[in-house]
Design a protein with these regions (language model features):
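Single conserved hydrophobic/aromatic residue that forms the stacking wall/gate
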Residues: 1-13
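Short, conserved glycine- and acidic-residue-centered signature motifs
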Residues: 3, 217, 531, 535
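Exposed loop/turn and edge beta-strand positions of beta-sandwich/beta-sheet ligand-binding modules
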Residues: 5, 57, 496-498
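Acidic active-site catalytic centers that drive phospho-/nucleotidyl reactions
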Residues: 6, 40, 199-202, 501, ...
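Conserved catalytic motifs of the protein kinase core domain
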Residues: 6, 112, 193, 499, ...
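Short, conserved active-site loop motifs that form the nucleotide-linked donor/cofactor pocket
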Residues: 7, 114, 556
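Phosphate-binding site recognition
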Residues: 14-470, 482-487
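Structural signature of nuclease core domains in nucleic-acid processing machines
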Residues: 446-573
Length: 573
């Protein structure tokens, strides 16, 4: 009977939710077409981005943001606003904020020929397939401008060149000159320089890094962008979006007209992702005001410039899914780079990653011009990549004299914590074993914990030679992180007369707290049991349980673990 009542209540709540949604606009899940988004769906107005651009008018603007933060929709907004067409596209803006800004801004509406390319779906396994996709994209953009076929101002040769690329027939050299050619033809036809918009320009570059055709794609993109964006007399303005700046690869070599807006810059900081006000307005519209705190805990936490930002993809999916929280963002694309980082990380970096998993901040040098190969070649570049790709947030920024930054970074929210846990455990193929270890900790079964730890180390650690106590500390932090929904996990904090290794502070009253102390030796003659007993004695002598007791935790389990190579001995106090 209780189950039947609960089920009826769930059905009733779901029905109320669906009826409420039926009265309101639909949520734009996966909609990147501006006209469609503004006419048939709930649209968060980002049109003041146009005002900010026209106030400064940099020749070429590059916006670097994580995936699924509204880049494609914003670029299509720019296309619809600026593009000269037979349709009166001002109707899409007259009820938007940009239209209230005055004639200085609105006079630009519908006045420019526009070239628009998005590389977001160029994800092939070989260079040959990648080039075919790029050539097809170029061909489709030429076809979109079929007014050039009947243009009275183009020469026969220019029309021949148009048909070559429109017909998907050009070779690599022809396609590399595609932007330059199309901008020339449009300038000549309309009598006005054109705007070039390139969305997700670095998607095929990341794919090239992953699938070993990196030199080919970088060489192609360098020539492609140089022809269209560098010293091009047919260019009015250019816009690019991507995850990385990729400056060091000379893709934008010598392009002095390029202005980059990264996640650390104040410019355009509120236009990619949702602000707090925008999220609250959306929740109010759908009658879900009471869900703000939960939504914030899961999907807030990003900081672009000085603006606090929510993940827009996850916010929309959360509200659409009857406000049931889960990791929506992790299913939007591959996380191979995270796995690559975990596989190649040094023991020190592994320990830092586990600290992040436990909710701690770490200090990191951030280079927003990080490139994909550096993830393998320079281990400390991983924090730069994780930050710009959306896997970390900035807590504090300390500008450096070389133009880069020292930052305190942390995992932004619950959703990204799930992504880390999934990738960490999947990469070691030890998901179920790690869960068993966490269960052994929770059930205080030291014999089982000892056996599982040794099994885990044998199966998941390729080389233990030279590992120090910090390595095992980091490994244990990661395993304890699975208990994060039951415990607040602290590491290397002062308590009593010293600093404990790991503390598990229960989130629910009445549950036991845990103190861990680790010892390590390389000496084959050292008795691990005696070493583990020494760890327990240290917990007692140093009064590491002081903080737990001060917080009202009465049941405290002390665990001492001694490591040597892939062996462990566990003692419980």
């Amino acid at each position: 009977e209780p189950y039947r009542r609960q089920r009826q209540m769930c059905i009733r709540d779901r029905t109320i939710h669906m009826n409420h949604f039926a009265k309101n606009k639909s949520l734009p899940i996966g909609v990147s077409d501006f006209k469609l988004a503004t006419t048939g769906y709930y649209y968060v107005d980002k049109t003041l981005m146009i005002r900010d651009f026209l106030d400064k008018k940099p020749m070429v603007s590059l916006f670097t943001r994580p995936r699924r933060f509204g880049k494609t929709l914003n670029m299509d907004m720019l296309r619809v606003f600026f593009e000269k067409t037979n349709e009166d596209t001002s109707v899409y803006f007259k009820d938007k904020q940009i239209w209230q800004c005055g004639d200085y801004y609105t006079k630009h509406q519908g006045q420019y020929p526009v070239i628009f390319l998005t590389f977001k779906d160029v994800k092939s396994m070989t260079w040959e397939e990648t080039f075919q996709k790029i050539r097809r994209l170029i061909s489709l953009e030429f076809i979109r401008h079929n007014e050039l076929e009947t243009s009275s101002v183009l020469t026969a040769y220019e029309k021949e060149q148009y048909h070559l690329l429109a017909g998907d027939s050009g070779d690599e050299v022809d396609c590399q000159m595609g932007l330059q050619l199309l901008s020339l033809l449009l300038h000549k036809h309309y009598g006005r320089e054109c705007i070039i918009i390139i969305d997700e320009y670095d998607t095929p570059i990341q794919q090239g890094h992953t699938c070993n055709f990196y030199p080919e794609i970088v060489n192609f993109m360098r020539n492609f962008f140089s022809g269209g964006l560098k010293d091009n007399p047919h260019l009015a303005f250019g816009f690019l979006t991507g995850i990385l700046r990729v400056a060091k690869e000379s893709i934008f070599s010598g392009m002095n007209n390029l202005k980059t807006y990264s996640i650390l810059d104040d410019g355009y900081s509120s236009y990619f992702g949702f602000t707090e006000k925008e999220v609250k307005d959306m929740l109010r519209y759908y009658g879900k005001d009471d869900k703000y705190n939960e939504l914030s805990e899961w999907y807030d936490g990003y900081r672009f410039g000085n603006t606090e930002i929510f993940n827009p993809w996850s916010v929309i999916n959360y509200i659409s899914d009857n406000c049931f929280p889960k990791a929506f963002w992790q299913s939007t694309g591959s996380n191979e780079i995270i796995g690559e980082i975990i596989q190649t990380a040094t023991p020190e970096i592994t320990k830092d990653l586990y600290k992040l998993l436990c909710g701690e901040k770490i200090a990191a040098y951030i280079d927003t011009g990080v490139i994909y190969p550096e993830v393998q070649n320079n281990p400390y570049s991983i924090y730069s990549f994780l930050l710009v790709a959306g896997y970390l947030k900035v807590a504090n920024i300390y500008p450096q004299s070389d133009g880069n930054f020292m930052c305190d970074v942390a995992i932004p929210n619950k959703e990204i914590t799930f992504v880390y846990e999934k990738e960490v455990l999947n990469r070691t193929n030890q998901n179920s074993l790690a869960i068993s270890i966490s269960q052994a900790i929770f059930s205080k079964d030291t014999q089982k914990l000892q056996s599982l730890l040794e099994d885990f180390m044998v199966k998941s650690i390729s080389s233990i030679d030279g590992a120090n106590e910090g390595f095992y500390h980091g490994m244990m932090l990661g395993l304890c992180a699975i208990l994060g929904n039951r415990y607040k996990i602290r590491s290397n904090r002062e308590s009593g007369l010293g600093r404990f290794d790991i503390q598990l502070m229960p989130l629910t009253k009445g549950m036991p707290g845990f103190i861990f102390e680790f010892k390590h030796t390389k000496d084959e003659h050292t008795d691990l049991s005696a070493l583990a007993d020494g760890a327990l004695q240290q917990i007692e002598a140093k009064k590491y349980d002081t903080e737990l007791r001060d917080n009202g935790v009465n049941s405290i389990i002390s665990i001492g673990i001694a490591f040597r190579g892939k062996s462990a001995v566990v003692r419980r106090g």
